[in-house]
Structures are given as structure tokens and as C-alpha cells.
Amino acid sequence: MFKFLSQMQLTRFFVGFRTVLWYFFAPKVTIKYPQEKGPISLRFRGEHALRRYKNGEERCIACKLCEVVCPAQAITIEAAPRESDGSRRATKYDIDMTKCIYCGFCQEACPVDAIVEGPNFEFARENREDLLYDKKKLLDNGSKWESALIKMLNRNDTTH
């Protein structure tokens, strides 16, 4: 009986050893994250950005649809008429990223594609105040990610 049990343990050992050797020489599936980055889907929703027209004018018309549709109530907008033509523009556009659930409703509701969720997922901060985005920060994000945002918005795949 002892001989049988020892043979069973030895068999299990070799099965385990074979598995270890198999995965040791198999192609690696993990990436070294900070140095290597994997592909990002065109549907990915990350850090928010406010876009501008090509002439530099802000796209946001302060319709407040994004504020109304936000289920987390993370968006706050204040509007005022412009002196030049009387159209409304956002004087204050704040997003509390600690409340945001990245649902994309704000992007879908916007009639002029002013607010979008960009490709950036590396925006971790050390304190909470840095996650309260104001209009300037959102416009800077839009300028920084404009080429990637255009690519994401003009994708042919519209199925959900």
C-alpha cells in the first residue's frame, strides 16, 4: 500500500512539473504596464474633455443637457449670454470626477459634441481636489486629446 501511495505522489509531482515547464516556455500574455501599454478600444470612456471648434471657439452652448442627464449629478454648469451675439456660453463647467460613473450619457446628450470622454485612463491623483475638473482643465484635456477624440467620434462601428 505504501508503494502505491508513493507512486501516486510522484505521478502528481511530474504532472505539476510538466505544467510549470509548459507555462515557463509558453508565450507571455501579460504586459509590463508602465513601460508597455495595451490597445484601447475605440469605445473606451475615460477622462472628460471639452472641445473647441477649429477657429478656437468653445463648442459648449450651455444647453445643460449633460447636467440634466447625468445620473450621478457630477456636472455643474452656469451660463451667461455673450456680449457679441447674445448666444449662451458656459461661464462655469465643473465635473466632479469622484462622482462620475463614466456612463457616457453626457457625451450622447450633447448636441454639438462639446463634452466627450477621451482615451486617457491614467489620471489617478493623490488628493481629492485634483479630481474636481473646472472648465479650464476640461478645455486643456480637449486640446491635448483632440486627434484621438476625432478618431473615436468618427468610428464606423456604431453598434452597442
From Swiss-Prot:
Gene3D superfamilies: 3.30.70.3270
Residues that, per the record, bind [4Fe-4S] cluster 2: C70, C100, C103, C106
Pfam family, one: Fer4_7
Enzyme kind, highest EC tier: translocase
Keywords of this entry: 4Fe-4S, Cell inner membrane, Cell membrane, Iron, Iron-sulfur, Membrane, Metal-binding, NAD, Quinone, Repeat, Translocase, Ubiquinone
Residues covered by the 4Fe-4S ferredoxin-type domain: 51-80, 91-120
Catalyses which reaction(s): a quinone + NADH + 5 H(+)(in) = a quinol + NAD(+) + 4 H(+)(out)
Cofactor binding: number and manner: Binds 2 [4Fe-4S] clusters per subunit.
GO CC list: plasma membrane
Binding residues annotated for [4Fe-4S] cluster 1, in chain numbering: C60, C63, C66, C110
GO terms of molecular function: 4 iron, 4 sulfur cluster binding; iron ion binding; NADH:ubiquinone reductase (non-electrogenic) activity; quinone binding
EC number: 7.1.1.-
Record bears the keyword Repressor: no
Cofactor: [4Fe-4S] cluster
Subcellular location field: Cell inner membrane
InterPro entries from the UniProt entry: 4Fe4S_Fe-S-bd, 4Fe4S_Fe_S_CS, NADH_quinone_OxRdtase_chainI
BP GO annotations: aerobic respiration
Role according to the record: NDH-1 shuttles electrons from NADH, via FMN and iron-sulfur (Fe-S) centers, to quinones in the respiratory chain. The immediate electron acceptor for the enzyme in this species is believed to be ubiquinone. Couples the redox reaction to proton translocation (for every two electrons transferred, four hydrogen ions are translocated across the cytoplasmic membrane), and thus conserves the redox energy in a proton gradient.
Subunit comment: NDH-1 is composed of 14 different subunits. Subunits NuoA, H, J, K, L, M, N constitute the membrane sector of the complex.
Record HAMAP family: NDH1_NuoI
Name by which UniProt lists this protein: NADH-quinone oxidoreductase subunit I
The species this protein was found in: Neorickettsia sennetsu (strain ATCC VR-367 / Miyayama) (Ehrlichia sennetsu)
